[in-house]
């Protein structure tokens, strides 16, 4: 599965901190029913066995809704469970190495906060960029804010031409 432009129309990223006592599965299913077009499992506090169990359950839900399922950071888990793709940050494995490991048919997203990072991600085979946070957020303590001018510069530098298949998504950090 490759990343199509419509996959990024409503890209949800999980964070159990904001569940307010609800189950992650229920919130994800509600989101899928509401029109989410791609889901990233980003649960930094879960131990690997719990993460894998959660990932398998949510992957099955996403498949029921024909929505790509992306694993955050963990390329080995994405590979082991045949996830649709993986999203990596600047301190994770480089996109070139991720592409070698996952092959040509998986979706690879890369976080970028600068034009240089965006261009390198494109060169190394990323299918989309996650740029942000564009607005201040309380949902990610270590988020580096990206100005609107920087976002525009990234969009100009990596224009998303069909031949490059590069997509961009700004991360506004909307929470329920």
Predicted ranges, named:
Residues 1-93, 100-127, 143-146, 153, ...:
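Conserved N-terminal beta1-alpha1 strand-loop-helix module at the mouth
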Residues 165-166, 170-175:
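Cationic, amphipathic, low-complexity alpha-helical segments enriched
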Residues 138-142:
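Short, glycine/charged-rich beta-strand-loop motifs at protein surfaces that mediate ligand recognition
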